[in-house]
C-alpha cells in the first residue's frame, strides 16, 4: 500500500539483521523523557531481535533524553531496528502505518496517543502502570505488558506471534466508539493531508 506521507525514514531499516519481506512495524509517539521510557524501548527492541523477530520500531517525538536514547541505540547495535523519526507536526500517518502501537512508559497519566492509535484501528500494547487499566480494557481493545524491559519484550513477543488476538482487538476497535466523531474526522483529515 502506498503511504500518504514521506516514508524515507523506512530506508534506515534496510540491511537489518534477520530482515524479512514483511517486518513488524512498531510505533511510539512521545516526549523523549524518563517517564516515557523510550530509552528502555531500545532494550525491548534488542530482546525481540535476539528472539529472531523482525521488528522495525520507529519513534516520533523529541526531548531531553535524545542523546541517552541515541547512545542506547548505538550500544545495543539497534541502528537498523530502532529509528528516531524526530518531531512531526502530524504523527497520525506514522501511527496509521504501524502494525502495533507501543506505549512503553514507566508511568503515565493518560496517554492521548493510545486513544488516537485505537481510533486509527491499531493494536495497542502499553506497559502496566497505576493508570494503565484506565487506558484500555486488557485483552479487549489492547494489551498491558510488564513494566520492565525483559517482561515487556516477552509480552510484546507473545502479542506479535498471536495474530488471532491482534485481529480480535482490531475488530473490537472497529465496533467501539471512543468519543466525539468530529475528533475522529479530524484525525482522518490530518492523515489524508
Locations of regions flagged by a protein language model:
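A charged, aromatic-enriched C-terminal amphipathic alpha-helix characteristic of glycosyltransferases
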Residues: 147, 164-192
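Nucleotide-activated donor-binding/catalytic signature segment of Leloir-type glycosyltransferases, i.e.
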Residues: 70-86
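Conserved donor-binding/catalytic core segment of Leloir-type glycosyltransferases
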Residues: 18-36, 42-45
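Conserved acidic donor-binding segment of nucleotide-sugar-dependent glycosyltransferases
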Residues: 138-139, 143-149, 158-163
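Aromatic "clamp/platform" in nucleotide-sugar-dependent glycosyltransferases that forms part
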Residues: 87, 106
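Short acidic/histidine- and often glycine-rich active-site loop of Leloir-type glycosyltransferases
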Residues: 116, 129-139, 143-144
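Short hydrophobic beta-strand element within catalytic cores of glycosyltransferases
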Residues: 123-127
Amino acid at each position: 500500500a502506498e503511504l500518504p506521507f514521506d516514508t524515507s525514514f523506512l530506508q534506515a531499516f534496510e540491511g537489518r539483521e534477520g530482515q524479512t519481506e514483511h517486518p513488524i512495524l512498531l510505533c511510539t509517539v512521545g516526549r523523549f523523557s524518563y517517564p516515557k521510557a523510550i530509552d528502555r524501548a531500545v532494550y525491548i527492541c534488542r530482546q525481540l531481535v535476539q528472539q529472531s523477530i523482525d521488528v522495525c520500531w520507529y519513534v516520533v517525538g523529541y526531548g531531553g533524553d535524545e542523546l541517552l536514547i541515541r547512545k542506547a541505540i548505538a550500544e545495543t547495535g539497534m541502528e537498523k531496528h530502532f529509528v528516531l523519526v524526530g518531531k512531526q507536526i502530524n504523527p497520525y500517518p506514522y501511527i496509521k502505518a504501524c502494525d502495533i502501537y507501543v506505549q512503553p512508559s514507566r508511568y503515565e497519566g493518560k496517554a492521548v496517543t493510545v486513544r488516537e492509535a485505537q481510533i486509527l484501528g491499531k493494536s495497542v500494547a502499553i506497559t502496566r502502570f497505576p493508570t494503565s487499566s484506565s487506558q484500555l480494557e486488557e485483552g479487549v481493545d489492547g494489551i498491558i505488558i510488564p513494566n520492565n524491559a525483559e517482561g515487556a519484550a516477552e509480552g510484546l513477543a507473545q502479542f506479535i506471534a498471536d495474530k488471532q488476538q491482534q485481529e480480535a482487538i482490531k475488530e473490537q476497535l472497529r465496533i467501539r466508539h471512543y468519543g466525539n466523531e468530529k475528533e475522529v474526522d479530524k484525525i482522518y483529515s490530518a492523515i489524508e493531508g
